[in-house]
Amino acid sequence: MPKKVFQQEDVEQKITENFEPKQEFEQDELDIEMDCSQFETTMDRQNTDIPFQHMVRPKVTMWQKLLMATICLFSCGILAQSVQWLVDSWRDNQWIAFVFAMVSLFLVLLGLGTIIKEWRRLVQLKKRLILQEKSREIRSKSAVNLTEVSSEGKELCLKIASLMGIDDKSPQLIAWQEQVHEAYTEQEILRLFSQNVLIPFDRVAKKLISKNAVESALIVAVSPLAIVDMFFIAWRNIRLINQLAKLYGIELGYVSRLRLLRMVFVNMAFAGAAEVIQDLGLEWLSQDITAKLSARVAQGIGVGILTARLGIKAMEFCRPIAVAPEEKLRLSHIQTELLGTLKTTLFSANKVKEKVR
């Protein structure tokens, strides 16, 4: 192996090339701002939401089919027995038994009517989710398919307007119909419908979500009873989902409400709501804000963020057209108002108490 000779000057030159001149920072010049958009964009790119088709069309197992068949046979048997009891009581002149038979038949019919009503509301919810799936398919079409002009997008929008109960003479709907041109693609028609017809509904929904998030945070931050907070926040979250569903024209029954709640909570858990809260908590910690806040205020912030996350997911499920990335409501849109309201309300109250003392 040939001998290599190194010069001291060459070694020092290579070492100095790997170093950069030092930079000094003053504490006053550091300004850390909370920005959730980068984290949320990363989560969106990861595509953490549960595949939509699994929620819209879940697989029905054999046990579920057997259970539904058993319930149907049992309901038919109860109805037939009630009618038979009514006929026998009338024929035998047993008037007391006849009254009981009438009451039982009324209760059976009431129960069957409730079941049919719940089933219709479930079908309505499923139709809304299927419309969302169709809008997603239209938006995901390739550029080759977009060149084919089709009336499918316009028919879908008119069907959505009918399901939402929007009047044909509505100014927003008329403005959308005037802007639609034959040369427009399905994606452009959906975008115009969303901008002209659905944006007013989205604004009301965003106000509801922001209002409920701030109020929930204040309630938890002020209230000393954890059990009362738990039930009260649960009631307010269910009420928020009902308001959003009613806003977008969905009539929820007991079963359909449970199903919507299940889809929202499962999607929240899968999307990593805890990671969002952890990220926001680290940002607040970097600003040294948590040192000024009490434990109750920190809990209020966490509850407010969870309420906002719940409202955002419920809005995405209730909206008839899938939310586009530029239309999506983010936590960063709510956290500024949430933190500002808490600081203004609680810190001003503490200052008033100190002045009184």
From Swiss-Prot:
Keywords assigned: Cell inner membrane, Cell membrane, Membrane, Transmembrane, Transmembrane helix
From the Swiss-Prot or TrEMBL record, state where the protein is found. Answer: Cell inner membrane
Q: Which residues cross the membrane?
A: 67-87, 96-116, 213-233
The organism's place on the tree of life at top rank: Bacteria
Regarding the membrane, this protein is recorded as: Multi-pass membrane protein
Q: Which residues form a coiled coil?
A: none
List the record's Gene Ontology CC terms alphabetically.
Answer: plasma membrane
InterPro entries for this protein: DUF697, UPF0283
NCBIfam families (UniProt xref): hyp_HI0043
Recorded family membership: Belongs to the UPF0283 family.
What PANTHER family does the annotation carry? UPF0283 MEMBRANE PROTEIN YCJF
**Protein known as:** UPF0283 membrane protein HSM_0945
- Name the species this protein comes from: Histophilus somni (strain 2336) (Haemophilus somnus)
